Amino acid sequence: MTELSVPSQLPAGATPEGDGIAVGDGPVRVDLYIDFLCPFCKQFELGANDVLTSLLGEHQATLVYHPMNFLDEASTTRYSTRASAASGCASDGGRFVEFVHQLFVGQPPEGGAGLSDQEITEIGVSAGVDQAAFASCLGDGRYHEWPTFVTSRAAQAGVEGTPTVRVNGTDIEPDAGSLTAAVQQAQKDS
């Protein structure tokens, strides 16, 4: 696989490597490799949302989301790329975590067109972003290249599917209980 160069435009909150969005300031790093069309990612997000929110609110972890386009072929409109690019627009608007959650709540089934850009914009607005700025970002394709870069970097890091959850570099089962236990263990080990 040829290494892709870092896209010229990265969302606010992007990691220094450009391969994810960092949220929070806690000492334990939790990497979340997700695809917005992945039903198991939705299951993880909905099942672990309270834990993720608590980790952020209590400054226990820095969450690094890696929005991938792993499942682009499972939709007729490259939905994974469009949704991941839109998450970058939401990050610019300071509502990344809220947008991710709302996008998973409204997840379309695999095999179809996915949500339209208008529907994605409505989800962004419900998550609290400015409609005009978000629609402009989405419409001009500002972060359209970014999900392919994120996916390439994830493959180089050994990610073979979504969701992949890593705590301080160690893969764990993608569920709330495993996440809680792994973060607690990482805190003890530090």
For the regions a protein language model found, what residue spans apply to each?
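Extracytoplasmic/secreted cell-surface and envelope-processing proteins
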Residues: 41, 73-74, 113, 173-176
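A mature extracytoplasmic/lumenal domain signature
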Residues: 34, 67-69, 103, 138, ...
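A structure-centric signal for secondary-structure junctions around beta-strands
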Residues: 18, 27, 83, 161-162
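Extracytoplasmic thiol/disulfide redox context detector
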Residues: 1-75, 151, 185-190
